[in-house]
C-alpha cells in the first residue's frame, strides 16, 4: 500500500487553515526554476490511449484523449510514450517484489524491445518510490500507477522521493482496470503522456468546509456590526435632530419675547460715542431696527436673529437668553420647564444668592428698557425675589458663636465687646 499523499500538496488530518495559508504564502514567495514546480502545485497529464489488435489482417486503432492523469510530485515534467506493460503474474500487479519481471513486446520481425511504460497497481505494502524504481531498473520509460479498487477514477499527487529518473503518473482505478483487461485479452495498448495544466494546492473537503464556515461567520459578523452601527448612528442622528428642533423652537419663543426698537436721530447709539453692531461691524443709523437682548446688548435684528436661532447666546457676552428668560430645556426628553432653584444648604446659599443677584440685575435692566409691556418677566422677577427672601431667611436662622483668635493680646480686651455685639446682632 502506497503512502498517503504528501502534506505539501493537500492539507489533511490535523492540518489547520493557518498552516494551509502559510504553505500558500511560502509557495508564492519561493522562486522556481524553469521546468520545476512548487511543492503545492499539481500538474495534470493529457493521456492519448490507443488500442490495436495485433496479428490480424486489419490494422485497426482506436484512441481517446483525456486529462485523467496526475504527475507525481518528484516526477520530471516531460512527455513520454510507449506500450503499456503490466508485471508478469496475476499476483504481481503491485510490483512490490524486487524480482518482478515485465514481458516487453519487441519490434515486429526483430528482437529489439519497443519503448514501454510499466502499468502498476497501487498498494501491496511498498511505496510509490519502490514501484517506480523497479520499473526504471527493468528499462521502462515511465511508470503508470492506477489507484486502489473501489476508488473509481480518483487520483492523488504521488510522493516518491529518490525515484526521479523516469516519468511517473497516477490514473484512476476504472481507467487502469479497463486498460489491464484489454492487455490481458491480447490487445496492445499504447499511451502518449503529455504535460497538462498546472493547478493550485489541493484542498480536501474538510478544509473547504472550514474555509466556507469561517468566511460565512466573518461575513455575518461584519454585516451584523454594520447594521448595528448604522442603526445606532441613525438613532443618534434622529435624537440630535429632535433636540435641535426643540432648541430652535425654544429660541424662537425666546426671540419673540425680546424687545424690538427703531433707532431715531438723537439716540445715544447714533451719537458720536455710539457703538456698532458686533455682528455686521456697521455703525447704527437712524431707522435701524435693533433687537435688545436680556443683557442689554443691542444688535441689528436681521443680524442677531439667525445667530440666536443657532446659538441662543449673546454674541458679545455669551449670555444664554433661554436661562435669562427662565426657560430650562431638559436634554433627555426636550421638555421645557420653568425652574427656580432654591438651596437649603448654607454653603450653597451664598453662591445661589450671587447668581440670582446677577440674574435679577440683568432682568431688571432689561425690564427698565422693555417697560411695562412684559408681565411674564415681572412675574419671574417677583418669584425670584421671593426665593431670595426664603434663602436669606434660612441663612439668618442659623448662628454660630465664634470668638476669633487674636494674635495681639493688648487689643484683645478692647475688641471683644464689639465682636460679642456683632454675634448678638446675627442671632437677632
From Swiss-Prot:
GO terms for biological process: negative regulation of cytokine production; positive regulation of protein catabolic process in the vacuole; protein localization to lysosome; protein ubiquitination; regulation of protein stability; ubiquitin-dependent protein catabolic process. Glycans are attached at residues 48, 59, 101. InterPro entries: PA_dom_sf, PA_domain, Znf_RING, Znf_RING/FYVE/PHD, ZNRF3_Arkadia_E3_ligases. One of its GO terms (cellular component) is cytoplasm. Residues 360-371 have a biased composition (Polar residues). Its EC number is 2.3.2.27. The chain crosses the membrane at residues 208-228. Residues 1-38 form the signal peptide. Its main location: cytoplasm. One of its GO terms (molecular function) is ubiquitin protein ligase activity. Pathway: Protein modification; protein ubiquitination. It catalyses: S-ubiquitinyl-[E2 ubiquitin-conjugating enzyme]-L-cysteine + [acceptor protein]-L-lysine = [E2 ubiquitin-conjugating enzyme]-L-cysteine + N(6)-ubiquitinyl-[acceptor protein]-L-lysine. The keyword Plastid does not apply. It is found in: Cytoplasm; Endomembrane system; Cytoplasm, Cytoskeleton; Cytoplasm, Perinuclear region. Residues 346-428 are annotated as: Disordered. The keyword Cytoplasm applies. E3 ubiquitin-protein ligase that catalyzes 'Lys-27', 'Lys-48'- or 'Lys-63'-linked polyubiquitin chains formation and plays a role in different biological processes such as modulation of immune response, cytoskeletal dynamics or protein homeostasis. Inhibits IL2 and IL4 transcription, thereby playing an important role in the induction of the anergic phenotype, a long-term stable state of T-lymphocyte unresponsiveness to antigenic stimulation associated with the blockade of interleukin production. Binding to E2 ubiquitin-conjugating enzyme requires an intact RING finger domain. This is E3 ubiquitin-protein ligase RNF128. It comes from Homo sapiens (Human). The lineage of its organism: Eukaryota, Metazoa, Chordata, Craniata, Vertebrata.
